[in-house]
Amino acid sequence: MEVTEQMAATLAQNAVTHFWQVREAQAVKQRNSGKADQGFRGAVTGGAQMNGFIEAFVKLANIAGVPEEAVYTKSRFLELPGYFRPTKEWDLLIVLEGVLLAAIEAKSQVGPSFGNNFNNRIEEAMGSALDLWTAFREKAYKRTVRPWLGYIFLLE
C-alpha cells in the first residue's frame, strides 16, 4: 500500500484532534479533582497528548512493511544507551533484528510561555540527538545502518 497525501493528512488531523481531546479531558479531570494547579499545567501533566502522533507513525511504519514486532512504543521497552547519560527513553523505536532503524520523540508546546519552554524543548532535542549520535559513533549500536532520528513538535 502506498501512503497518499490524503492518508497522511487524515493521520495528521486525527493526531491533532487526539491531542486536543486528551488535553481537554485532562483539564476537566484536574478541575473536578478539586486540586489547584498553575495555569494550564493540569491539562498537560497527565501525559498521552502526543499518542495520536505516535500511533500515526506506527501505521506509517506498518504500511512501509516494517513488521509489527519491530515497532516499540510506550507500551514496550524504549530505552536506548546514550554517551553523555546512561540511557534515554524514546516515544517510538524501530528495531529490526537487533539493529536500531529509527528513534522518534514527540513533544508539544502550547500556551503563553512560548519563549522559555520552546527554548527548553530545542535544547532537549539537540541534546538527545547529540547523545544518540555520539553513542552511535562510539559503537554503542550495531553499525550496519545509520538510524533515522526524528522529533515531531506540535506548536500552538
Where are these regions (language model features)?
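Catalytic cores of nucleic-acid endonucleases
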Residues: 108-156
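Conserved acidic residues
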Residues: 91, 101, 147-149
